[in-house]
């Protein structure tokens, strides 16, 4: 005889035929993904939108810790700066960094490349204001 708990009655077993394609807008650290994981729902990290780079770094550390790919390896420093500028990254969640700010000595080339790699690893579309339908 199997023992059941009250949680077995509160949380039904999810039955899906295909993994859920999770799209997280204003993703933060990925609470939606954590909830699906904790409920045992099969899902894939399909897309996310989070422009705050500290949150994106946390998201990657929590959900894609094994992805150590250097997506910026074939890019020059200038290409990385241009890509981050076009994506509209933020460090305060209130306004995007300007190209001059991204280029400044406040942010090292290593930091810029880490940001770019985190964006690519998490399938991050970054600034929701610049998204367009296809």
What are these regions (language model features)?
Residues 1-134:
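Conserved active-site and SAM-binding loop architecture
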């Amino acid at each position: 005889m199997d023992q059941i708990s009250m949680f077995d009655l509160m949380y039904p077993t999810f039955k899906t035929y295909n993994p859920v394609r999770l799209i997280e807008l204003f993703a933060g650290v990925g609470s939606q993904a954590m909830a699906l994981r904790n409920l045992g729902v099969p899902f894939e990290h399909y897309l996310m939108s989070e422009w705050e780079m500290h949150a994106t770094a946390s998201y990657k550390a929590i959900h894609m810790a094994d992805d150590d790919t250097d997506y910026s390896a074939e890019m020059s420093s200038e290409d990385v700066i241009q890509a981050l500028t076009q994506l509209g990254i933020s460090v305060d969640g209130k306004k995007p960094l300007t190209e001059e700010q991204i280029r400044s000595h406040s942010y090292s080339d290593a930091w810029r490349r880490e940001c770019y790699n985190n964006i690519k690893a998490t399938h991050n579309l970054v600034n929701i204001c610049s998204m367009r339908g296809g």
